[in-house]
């Protein structure tokens, strides 16, 4: 029998799963259809398509983990189950983080303006090497997830301790104690791509500030398209920073949940908050991307007309 908190958790996480799959699936479908029609795909759409596929995987793993915690709270007392879940989560998490970083760096290189030789070289090369960059993201994520699996597999101490525990809650606390260091370490490693995105964000803001100063010197009274592009990219990157911060805090909460008396409630709350990152940022991308937004509006308009008829 589920508690009221468990019922609320299942309802919320199911809703997030549906919205996440629909939102990210919509982006992938639109870009795929456009790719088929035009026989080519832009760099930003190519990065976005890979990103939403990674996010669908991340949302799925997080939802499975959340449901398993509710249905089978002693899952963390079983080495194999924990290793499998954590390995898949690590892979999807890192792949999502690095591809998002690629998207943010791409926005910066394509929108910002600078005369620095390194910037100009990267701006010229980005379209040519994007496939290799994304392949590198996949390789890094796979390597980190394999290392995570090996690290967790090498530590069997919790089996010996858990065998002497009868209470599931005690077993949960004991089984998670050996994983404190690796879990924390792998969470901290995710800061690396975030820092790269943060640097790109501040450099883009600096570029907008310099561009605005130039516009004021030669003001014509009309809206500047370059400024609008700058602002739209900054909004996208700001939403990423906000949702990632929420995601990171939620991950830390779940990592340290074994220290709390209401550990299960802490994990459930952390799961719900964490899924907002791959869900919310993708919805923001739809709103701020002209092509995705216009197609979505047309779909709603056609649906309304069909309902009237």
UniProtKB/Swiss-Prot annotation:
Extracellular side residue ranges read: 1-7, 72-82, 153-184, 261-266
Localization, UniProt: Membrane
UniProt keyword rRNA-binding, yes or no: no
One Gene Ontology term, aspect cellular component? plasma membrane
Location, primary (coarse class): membrane
Kindly give any further remark recorded in the entry. Answer: Most taste cells may be activated by a limited number of bitter compounds; individual taste cells can discriminate among bitter stimuli.
Q: From the Swiss-Prot or TrEMBL record, give the protein name.
A: Taste receptor type 2 member 8
Provenance organism: Pan paniscus
